Structures are given as structure tokens and as C-alpha cells.
């Protein structure tokens, strides 16, 4: 196991299943967490509120890492017409605003968009995708291009934007309710009161995934919290976990297949968009979310406010 992978595993345990020494470290780092909290809270004030004349929905979470934001955004796009996704485009090799997709046409490369944005671009029900560090510019561009609804991926902390805030709450909670670096929260937990709707897994949405068993496949993934795929680990001959947003190299994947005498890569769609041009046989792990009536009706009510 590489040093990078060991660090990822250590960090995962530190936030969710800490041992005695990791718990001690969390308390030692509390003064830094207080300082971080001060600046994080300060950053949410003193900015003019920006209001749009069309629906803007944000899907986010308080803790760092994957909680299912991408499949939930895609689920919203399947339920409502004319949805554009606006996101930062983490780990992309570009800066500024890029239109990744417009009206079912992909307009840039994976390097320019980042893996998450390109995953959205391949979703038929998502009509447009825009990456921009400045979410306000991204929203304006989306509406210029004909968006009926803008969904923001991971923008809960953008309190200067008037929007319908959906805060995801996973079944798997951090061990401590501390913020970084003592815990995994990016803002104090009391900030969840600022959400318009707290979406609880099992109550407001159902998460499910599917892939057929294939012992000629090697499971590789570079998503946050790969333990979410635990039910599929036994369906492949071997499993390898990489850092979130990791850029796969063709040679290393070839070596993994040869090592285990396999001919197929088993991966999520987010991983697939990064290897699709390598020529490997791939088997996609379908990760989906189904909205329950409680959340669906809240979104419908919000959208209807703009039809009056």
C-alpha cells in the first residue's frame, strides 16, 4: 500500500472510527478548530444577497467528502425539466468559467471540466453543465443558455446566494461533531438550521447501487468514502482504492489486470469517465438515488413559487 493510500485510510478512521490516540489528537487540535470556525463563520457574513428570478437549488453537506451529492443532483434532473448543474469543478486543469455541456452537447475535455462535471455531462436528463469557481457567474450563464432550474453541487456555504438549500445527512456520521481539523465538519453543526430541507437517507431519499458479480474483474475507484461500495467488494476478484479525484494511468490499470489475470475493470461512472478512452473492458457500478415524496414535494413547492 502506498503512503498516499495509507494516509487516506488513516484520515477515514480519524474522522469516523478513531482509535484512542486519534481521539487524543482531535482534542489537541481543538484550538485550531476554533480558529478555523471563526474564519469560516466570518466568511458567511458581509456579502450582499444575490436573488435570481428562476429556481436555484443547492445540494450540499456540512462534512467534507462524498455523501451522495452527485446522484441526488442527477435524481433531481430526472424529476424536473431544463436542469443545468453548476459546480466548482474540483481538480480540473482549468480556471474560470467553462460550459461543459449545453443542450446535450459536450463542449470541453475531461481535463477542463474535472471528473464530476463530466459525469453530469453524460447524464441524459441534465441539459447543461457549467464549472466555475464563481457560482454566481455560473448561475447567470446557465440561465442565459436557457436553464429552467439551476442545481448547485456543493454550495451550502454560499449564503450570499438566495437558493433552496438541501442538506444531505448520511447514515454514517463523523465520530465527533467537531470542525476541521479536529473533525470532518466544514462549518459548525448548528449551521444545519440554515438549510431549507435536511434530507435524511432512508426517510427522504433511497440510495441503491447495482453491479453483477464478475470474478474476472478488478474493482478500482477514486471516490470519497469508498466503503460505500462495500457490498460490491466480493463481486470482483480484487479491489483497489485511490485518492478522491485521482487521475488514473493506463499502465497502472493494465498492471492490476495482469496481476490478477482479469480482463475487466469494475468502477463507478465517475471513475469510468477518466478511463473510457483507455480501451479497457469496463463494468459500471450503478449508483442511484430515488427521491421520496417528502423531498420531491418540497422541491415542487419551491419551484411553483417562481410560476406565480
From Swiss-Prot:
Pathway(s) it belongs to: Glycolipid biosynthesis; lipid IV(A) biosynthesis; lipid IV(A) from (3R)-3-hydroxytetradecanoyl-[acyl-carrier-protein] and UDP-N-acetyl-alpha-D-glucosamine: step 6/6
Catalysed reaction, written as an equation: a lipid A disaccharide + ATP = a lipid IVA + ADP + H(+)
CC terms in the record's Gene Ontology section: plasma membrane
Short name of any one Pfam family annotated for the protein: LpxK
EC numbers: 2.7.1.130
PANTHER family (UniProt xref): TETRAACYLDISACCHARIDE 4'-KINASE (PTHR42724), TETRAACYLDISACCHARIDE 4'-KINASE, MITOCHONDRIAL-RELATED (PTHR42724:SF1)
NCBIfam families: PRK00652.1-5 (NF001892)
The name this protein goes by in its record: Tetraacyldisaccharide 4'-kinase
Lineage of source species: Bacteria, Pseudomonadati, Campylobacterota, Epsilonproteobacteria, Campylobacterales
Protein's gene: lpxK
Amino acid at each position: 500500500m502506498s503512503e498516499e493510500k495509507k494516509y487516506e485510510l488513516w484520515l477515514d478512521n480519524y474522522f469516523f472510527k478513531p482509535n484512542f490516540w486519534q481521539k487524543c489528537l482531535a482534542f489537541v487540535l481543538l484550538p485550531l478548530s476554533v480558529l478555523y470556525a471563526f474564519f469560516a463563520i466570518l466568511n458567511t457574513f458581509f456579502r450582499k444577497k444575490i436573488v435570481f428570478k428562476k429556481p436555484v437549488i443547492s445540494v450540499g453537506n456540512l462534512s467534507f467528502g462524498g455523501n451522495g451529492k452527485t446522484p441526488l443532483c442527477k435524481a433531481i434532473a430526472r424529476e424536473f425539466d431544463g436542469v443545468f448543474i453548476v459546480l466548482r469543478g474540483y481538480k480540473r486543469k482549468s480556471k474560470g468559467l467553462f460550459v461543459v455541456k449545453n443542450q446535450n452537447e459536450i463542449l470541453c475535455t475531461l481535463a477542463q471540466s474535472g471528473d464530476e462535471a463530466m459525469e453530469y455531462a453524460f447524464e441524459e436528463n441534465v441539459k447543461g453543465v457549467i464549472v466555475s469557481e464563481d457560482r454566481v457567474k455560473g448561475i447567470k450563464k446557465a440561465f442565459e443558455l436557457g436553464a429552467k432550474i439551476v442545481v448547485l453541487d456543493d454550495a451550502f456555504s454560499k449564503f450570499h446566494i438566495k437558493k433552496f438549500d438541501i442538506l444531505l445527512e448520511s447514515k454514517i456520521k463523523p465520530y465527533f461533531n467537531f470542525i476541521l481539523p479536529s473533525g470532518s465538519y466544514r462549518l459548525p453543526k448548528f449551521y444545519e438550521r440554515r438549510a431549507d430541507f435536511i434530507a435524511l437517507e432512508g426517510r427522504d431519499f433511497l440510495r441503491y447501487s447495482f453491479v453483477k458479480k464478475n470474478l474476472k474483474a478488478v474493482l478500482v475507484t477514486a471516490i470519497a468514502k469508498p466503503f460505500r461500495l462495500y457490498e460490491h467488494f466480493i463481486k470482483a476478484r480484487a479491489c483497489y482504492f485511490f485518492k478522491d479525484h485521482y487521475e488514473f494511468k493506463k499502465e497502472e490499470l493494465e498492471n492490476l489486470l495482469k496481476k490478477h489475470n482479469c480482463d475487466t475493470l469494475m468502477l463507478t461512472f465517475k471513475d469510468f469517465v477518466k478511463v473510457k478512452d483507455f480501451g479497457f473492458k469496463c463494468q459500471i457500478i450503478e449508483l442511484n438515488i430515488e427521491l421520496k415524496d417528502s423531498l420531491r414535494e418540497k422541491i415542487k413547492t419551491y419551484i411553483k413559487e417562481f410560476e406565480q
